[in-house]
Design a protein with these regions (language model features):
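Short beta-strand-loop/turn "lid" adjacent to the catalytic site in phosphate-handling enzymes
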Residues: 60-95, 99
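Conserved phosphate-binding catalytic cores of ATP/NTP-utilizing and phosphoryl-transfer enzymes
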Residues: 1-2, 103, 107-133, 300-304
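N-terminal phosphate-binding loop and adjacent alpha-helix
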Residues: 33-63
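A short helix-loop
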Residues: 2, 9-10, 19, 27-28, ...
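Glycine-rich beta-strand-to-loop/alpha-helix junction loops that act as flexible
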Residues: 72-75, 138, 262-270
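Glycine-rich phosphate-binding/hydrolytic loop that grips phosphoryl groups
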Residues: 114-118, 286-309
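A contiguous, well-structured pocket-lining segment that forms one wall/lid of small-molecule binding clefts
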Residues: 187-261, 267-284, 303-309
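Phosphate/pyrophosphate-binding loops at sites that engage ATP/ADP/AMP, CoA/4′-phosphopantetheine
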Residues: 56-69, 249-259
Length: 309
């Protein structure tokens, strides 16, 4: 059997996927966690409840009877103290299924799942054999990390740089809510920005390799207060994020060396942001379905761990 189940229960989405290692194809199913209009997200207790409701529904629509193993994200990052209760839902389900079906369970982080999903989507999974840089840009992280092959973890993750305050996904959602969009706001903010004909350039606020994004929130609020059209505010926000990521990329490459770079995470589903980074040498981007939270990466993680064993 060459089928591997992946699970991911983040603070945004309930996700499951089945990866067929024999032909490198994937079938995924996922569902956003419901958020009340006007709210900025879910408390962890509410996220755990929603995952408990949604995960059986998600799994019932996937062919999991012949799987050889399970991959699951159990924490946000592979770092000491990294913890979020919502990941217990996926971890518990994976443990029960693994025991019932007598198949192994391999545990990893949400971040590694994002990176592997992006590499798979970009047809760059071969990169895991050598060092490369990865950006994980989402509601919880704006990180650049060095990824190196590791016998035990598959990928050894070393932080290179990050946002010191607001994360890019938080900025997107906060600006979207200012403009009356529903949370999470990424897709609608991009649609709004596409209507703008203006060009925006932003000088990033940097502290060595790290960035600061909180000033952007204030700029967007001021623009709204001054009567700037919503489409221009949206584009202002997204162009600024892309300028920040480009500067982080330049500084990380200067520090670490000329390595391949993959851009992962929900914010990187935005085509306006991708467009500004397309000229980065040796870069790779995931398709939107593999940028947003998903379980494809954890399914592939299980397959790779199985092959290694």
């Amino acid at each position: 059997m060459s089928f591997f189940l992946g699970l991911d229960t983040s603070n945004y989405t309930t996700s499951a996927a089945v990866y067929d290692a024999s032909n490198n194809t994937v079938l995924q199913n996922k569902k956003l966690l419901p958020v009340k209009p006007g709210e900025k997200g879910l408390r962890q207790s509410d996220a755990v409840f929603q995952h408990t409701v949604q995960l059986p529904q998600i799994l019932s629509q996937l062919p999991i009877s012949d799987i050889s193993g399970i991959g699951v994200s159990v924490k946000p990052r592979n770092s000491e103290g990294s913890y979020m209760p919502c990941f217990l839902c996926g971890e518990g389900t994976a443990g029960m299924l693994g025991h019932a079906m007598q198949v192994p369970v391999w545990k990893t982080s949400h971040q590694v799942g994002h990176i592997l999903a992006a590499l798979y989507s970009a047809e760059k999974l071969s990169w895991i054999r050598e060092p490369f840089l990865a950006f994980h840009v989402s509601g919880g992280t704006t990180d650049c990390v060095l990824c190196e092959p590791d016998e035990a973890l598959l990928l050894r993750i070393t932080p290179v740089s990050c946002s010191l305050d607001l994360k890019a996904g938080q900025l997107v959602d906060r600006v979207g809510l200012m403009l009356g969009l529903e949370f999470p706001c990424g897709i609608e903010l991009e649609k709004l920005a596409m209507q703008s004909t203006r060009t925006f350039r932003y000088k990033p606020t940097m502290k060595e390799l790290d960035c600061c994004l909180s000033g952007l929130e204030n700029q967007c609020q001021s623009a709204i207060n001054n009567g700037e059209p919503p489409c221009d505010v949206a584009k202002r926000c997204l162009c600024a994020i892309s300028d920040v990521l480009l500067e982080m990329t330049k500084r990380a490459s200067a520090q670490i060396g000329d390595l391949p770079i993959v851009y992962a995470g929900g914010v990187m589903a935005d085509l306006l942001i991708q467009e500004k980074l397309q000229n980065v040498k040796k870069s790779a981007f995931a398709k939107p379905a593999f940028s947003c939270d998903n379980a494809v990466g954890t399914a592939i993680y299980a397959s790779l761990c199985n092959a290694g064993n």
